[in-house]
Amino acid sequence: MSSFAIAEKVVDIFPSTETTAPIIYLNTFSGEGQKIYEAARAANYPQFTLVAISDLGWNHDMVPWDSPSAFKNADPFTGGADDYLRLLTEEIIPTAEKEIKGVPSWRGILGYSLAGLFALYAIYQTDLFSRVGSMSGSLWFPGMKEYIFSHETKCRPDCMYFSLGDKESKTRNPLLRSVRQNTEEIQAFYQGKGIDTGFQLNPGNHYNHAVERTAAGICWLLSR
C-alpha cells in the first residue's frame, strides 16, 4: 500500500501486481479501505487495484446540491460534489495512476451510503468510469431520482450494482422511507436501457456489515 494527501484528503492505493488489472475508486466514511480491500481479495475474484479516499467532508463532498438535514439536530447537506469531483478527476486520479504499473483495463467508482449517491452522480459529470456500485446508497436524497430520470450519463456504463439492507426503508423518517422504492426504480431504469445491472437485498439495516456489503459490490463488478 502507498498513500498520498491532496487538499486534505488522504488517498490509499492498494495495487495489483497485474499491469492490466482494473482500478476501482472508493470514497470512504472513516478510512475503511484496507478492510474492504482485504475482504474483496479474499473472495478470489480477478485482481484489481483499489484507490480509497478518506477524510472527506461527508455531507458536503458527497452531495450534489444543498438540502436540509435528514436527521434532527444534524448538519444540513451543502452541495460540494462538483468541486470534489473536479479534485478527483483532475488531481487524485492522475496522481494515483502514476503510482501503478501499466494501464487499467477499466475504471470503476463505488461507495456506501452518501458515497453511493456520489458514484451515481459522478457518471453524469464525467466519462472516466465504466462500472458503478452504490451499496446502501442514499438514493432517498431529495431530487436525485428525478435528476437521474431526466439527464444523460456522460458515457454508457458497462454495468451497475446496487444493494440495500431489507430494514433500511422501515423507518418513521419520511425521507429515508423512500430508499428501497427509489433504489429499485433507479435500478429498473438503467436495466430498461439495456445496461447490465444487479440488485442485492441484504438482511439488516443501514449500519450492518458495511465492509462486507461494499466488498460484495466490488466482487460483482469484477465478475462481469
Where are these regions (language model features)?
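Serine-hydrolase catalytic machinery in alpha/beta-hydrolase-like enzymes
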Residues: 10, 20-99
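Conserved hydrolase catalytic core segment
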Residues: 121-131
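Short beta-strand immediately N-terminal to the catalytic nucleophile in serine-hydrolase-like folds
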Residues: 106-111, 135
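Gly/Ala-rich beta-loop-alpha elbow adjacent to hydrolase catalytic centers
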Residues: 110-115, 119
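A short loop-to-beta-strand scaffold at the N-terminal edge of the catalytic core in hydrolase folds
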Residues: 2-17
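A general structural motif
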Residues: 20-22, 47, 104-106, 129, ...
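The feature captures the conserved acid-bearing segment of alpha/beta-hydrolase catalytic domains
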Residues: 139-221
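A conserved amphipathic alpha-helix that caps or lines the catalytic cleft of carbohydrate-
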Residues: 40-41, 123, 187
